[in-house]
């Protein structure tokens, strides 16, 4: 009986020793899983190793990669925040952090973050989208229109582009009705080929030139030759503005610039 008890105790010691001594085998197996792209298995294995070697670093990085590959960038950010100096941790952290900033409406900050990432992943597209959101919020419609278009089908960029185009077009029509032809011209030109923007821009340009020409005539009749000259010279190519500028220029002793 005593002999059996001793054998059982010896067997128990051997079992305990095999469980607690030399975790390097488990570590190496976890590293192999990581190298094979089996990040979920690797994360679980490294987490079981506790503080052994740099298992915590591998565990956080692997867990981050699992979420990253699933497109869960916001959820992955805290994991990469722990390992910013490990492998591609910093780059992946910045990419995920940009998504966090975007989700929180910090579009200027997100744009700066994605811009700094250069051609990493789709950072260039994400920069355009967030820059457009920031520009639109600050009434910089020209930048917003361009960047939404460059953002393509990311998120709701296409919908926002269409909505903004409609808004700008309606504003241009209102300005045109108010005879603010220069401002309307700017907006229609900004819209390019959207709807009939090109034709409306042409009409606004004609009205604007007519108005400026009439203004120059008034200045001339009131004796303001310099003011009339400045306007006529700016209208070079329109009606007889070039001839009028030349005539007034001779009266003022100004040589008309050569226009090819």
Where are these regions (language model features)?
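Alpha-helical tetratricopeptide repeat
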Residues: 23-34, 57-68, 91-102, 125-136, ...
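Alpha-helical solenoid scaffolds that mediate protein-protein interactions
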Residues: 48-50, 82-84, 117-118, 151-152, ...
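C-terminal motif of bacterial Sec signal peptides marking the signal peptidase cleavage site
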Residues: 15-18
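Positively charged n-region of N-terminal signal peptides that target proteins for export
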Residues: 1-5
């Amino acid at each position: 009986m005593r002999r059996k008890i001793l054998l059982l105790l010896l067997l128990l010691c051997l079992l305990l020793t095999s469980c607690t001594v030399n975790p390097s085998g488990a570590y190496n197996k976890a590293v192999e899983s990581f190298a094979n792209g089996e990040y979920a298995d690797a994360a679980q294995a490294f987490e079981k190793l506790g503080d052994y070697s740099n298992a915590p670093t591998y565990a956080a990085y692997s867990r981050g990669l699992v979420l990253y590959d699933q497109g869960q960038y916001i959820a992955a950010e805290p994991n990469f925040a722990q390992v910013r100096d490990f492998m591609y941790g910093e780059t992946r952290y910045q990419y995920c952090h940009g998504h966090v900033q975007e989700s929180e409406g910090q579009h200027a900050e997100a744009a700066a973050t994605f811009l700094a990432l250069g051609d990493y992943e789709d950072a260039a597209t994400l920069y355009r989208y967030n820059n457009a959101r920031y520009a639109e919020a600050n009434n910089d419609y020209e930048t917003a229109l361009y960047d939404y278009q460059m953002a393509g089908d990311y998120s709701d960029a296409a919908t926002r582009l269409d909505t903004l185009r409609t808004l700008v077009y309606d504003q241009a029509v209102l300005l045109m009705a108010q005879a603010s032809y220069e401002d309307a011209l700017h907006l229609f030109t900004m819209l390019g080929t959207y709807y009939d923007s090109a034709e409306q821009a042409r009409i606004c340009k004609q009205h604007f030139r007519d108005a400026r020409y009439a203004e120059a005539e008034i200045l001339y009749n009131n004796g303001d030759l310099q003011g009339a000259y400045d306007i006529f010279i700016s209208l070079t190519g329109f009606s007889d503005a070039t001839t009028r500028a030349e005539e007034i220029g001779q009266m003022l002793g100004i040589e008309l610039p050569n226009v090819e």
